[in-house]
Amino acid sequence: QRQMCIRDSFYIVSLSTKSIIYKGMLSSLQLRNYYPDLTNSYFTSGLALVHSRFSTNTFPTWGLAQPFRLLAHNGEINTIRGNRGWMEARESVLSTPDLGDIKEIRPIIQPGMSDSASLDNVLEFLVMSGLSLPHAMAMLVPESFNEKNPISEDLKSFYEYHSILMEPWDGPAALLFSDGRFAGGMLDRNG
């Protein structure tokens, strides 16, 4: 993918066997006409996520059109500069038996992408490394907790432990995610 995308003229939407991702510079009402398989009565799904907002802080391109491979995002990632920098800094020490030689897939965050696409890159890396999608999302985007919004000690320990491994990706942001097996939605601590 890295070699094909260098020319900026090719984007792999997904190679998943569990989900189909449709993209188009069109409204939600136009989807059925553009993708006729959506009107086929034999074509069914247990879940669907839709993102129909146009880009506001980046020039629209296929690579930046949402939804991404695992994520649809509405909002801003205000910590994006630090998130990208820390992810790049830790790439040299990352390892996982599930992905083989990490050097072959670096950089994990593709350059020139939006904040949403960068978050999706890291989410995809964590899931392909063996974490479940809900685990990876909770690690990247921890929920807010305080005296007015208490959480269990186990969950608090989960967030404290993961804060050592990964800094939070904070917005304000609303996020939808799916890997074809799980689907979920959440707000970040500022959403």
Residue ranges and their predicted role:
Residues N78, R84-E160:
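Conserved catalytic alpha/beta cores of large enzymes that bind or transform nucleotide phosphates
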